[in-house]
Design a protein with these regions (language model features):
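N-terminal catalytic or cofactor-binding beta/alpha core of small enzyme domains
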Residues: 1-91, 96-185
Length: 185
């Protein structure tokens, strides 16, 4: 079930939290793979989410922050690292994307792997089991220019919402696994 909502819609945020909680509950390990670069305002959504998530919930297993971004040049290496270090983990990919004018500032949960770079005509490997995308600007004839001319304020606020929702879902996941492990003992 895919979800799309304006980032300021509290009902949408609650729906996202409920769906994320449902998706991760049966997995022992959850990895958050935040894709993008802080060198382009529109593409900084992923690294901002990763940074905010690590601040809110330091135990989260996050790849991709402002300090250590995951981008086109290192994506394959990071995906390989995740597969080796976290076999069988459930991976949630986070990235910015371009869309219709009417969809700008929307957050989407898509229940299939992410195709990073598709909006700017890059061919990169699919990543994640599900993905969260923030529609940061409109798509068009010159996608590189559009993603560069995106308001950081909007991206920042969307990243805060995504990170906060992920933190809540992961905290609930940790508590569930702790109780589950106690019952198994």
């Amino acid at each position: 079930m895919d979800i799309i909502f304006h980032y300021q819609d509290p009902k949408g945020q609650q729906t996202l939290l409920q769906r994320l909680t449902s998706l991760i509950k049966s997995h022992r390990e959850v990895i958050i793979l935040c894709i993008g670069t802080d060198r382009v305002s529109g593409d900084s959504l992923g690294p901002l989410v990763g940074t905010f998530l690590k601040e809110e919930y330091p135990q989260a297993k996050v790849y991709g922050t402002l300090e250590e971004p995951v981008h086109a040049k290192n994506l394959e290496e990071i995906v390989t690292t995740v597969r080796i270090k976290h076999p069988g983990a459930f991976v949630i990919a986070v990235d910015a994307c371009l869309g219709r004018v009417s969809s700008i500032e929307n957050i989407m949960l898509v229940e299939k792997p992410l195709k990073p770079g598709a909006g700017v005509n890059k061919t990169l490997p699919e990543v994640g089991h599900v993905n969260i995308q923030g529609i940061v600007n409109m798509s068009g004839f010159v996608p590189h220019l559009l993603i560069q001319n995106t308001r950081l304020y909007t991206v920042y606020n969307m990243a805060r919402i995504i990170a906060g929702t992920l933190a809540q879902a992961l905290i609930g996941h940790k508590q569930f696994n702790y109780i589950y492990n106690l019952r198994q003992a």
